[in-house]
Amino acid sequence: MKNWISSFILVHQEKSISFNTNILETNLINIIILLIILFYFLKGLLKDNLSSRQENILSTIQNSENRINEANERLVDAKLQWSQAQITLEELKNQTLQNKLILFNAEFEIKNQVLSQHFNNLLMTLYYREQQAFNNIKKQVSELALKKVIAKLQAPLMEEDQSVIIINKIHRLGGNLE
């Protein structure tokens, strides 16, 4: 027991008490005890940090999957709008051809101008809807790509932040990290 106490505390000839700062020269048992104590006090901190990091990663993955599903739904809606626009365009083309045949028999010049103007307006409307659908798809794909890139860039930074926090905690507990 005396050796046990003397490995931590040195009693000099003047009878003064001080801590033995050279732990590596004391013995292997003290080193093992020190490691056990450090592990005991730091395991809760490490477990909390790792579990919170895991929760963050899982929530980020879930959010990304939700955004991808939303983007897929929007893509399906945009494709449906596109097909409806194509059907409407075909119907308009058929109607225009029928109207042109009728116009040859009646007042050709006036009705032709009105019909052409109407057809151009419809084409402009369809073109606008087509561009709007394309821009929506492009925007969603760009947002998803940027979010994935940002998530990939932030992941290593967050791991470095975790190591800085752990090193600071070790220094607060009086540990020496070399």
From Swiss-Prot:
It is a single-pass membrane protein. It comes from Vaucheria litorea. This is ATP synthase subunit b, chloroplastic. One of its GO terms (cellular component) is chloroplast thylakoid membrane. F-type ATPases have 2 components, F(1) - the catalytic core - and F(0) - the membrane proton channel. F(1) has five subunits: alpha(3), beta(3), gamma(1), delta(1), epsilon(1). F(0) has four main subunits: a(1), b(1), b'(1) and c(10-14). The alpha and beta chains form an alternating ring which encloses part of the gamma chain. F(1) is attached to F(0) by a central stalk formed by the gamma and epsilon chains, while a peripheral stalk is formed by the delta, b and b' chains. InterPro entries: ATP_synth_b/b'su_bac/chlpt (IPR002146). Keywords: ATP synthesis, CF(0), Chloroplast, Hydrogen ion transport, Ion transport, Membrane, Plastid, Thylakoid, Transmembrane, Transmembrane helix, Transport. In plastids the F-type ATPase is also known as CF(1)CF(0). F(1)F(0) ATP synthase produces ATP from ADP in the presence of a proton or sodium gradient. F-type ATPases consist of two structural domains, F(1) containing the extramembraneous catalytic core and F(0) containing the membrane proton channel, linked together by a central stalk and a peripheral stalk. During catalysis, ATP synthesis in the catalytic domain of F(1) is coupled via a rotary mechanism of the central stalk subunits to proton translocation. It comes from the Eukaryota. It is found in: Plastid, Chloroplast thylakoid membrane. Its main location: plastid. Belongs to the ATPase B chain family. It holds the Pfam family ATP-synt_B. HAMAP family: ATP_synth_b_bprime (MF_01398). One of its GO terms (molecular function) is proton-transporting ATP synthase activity, rotational mechanism.
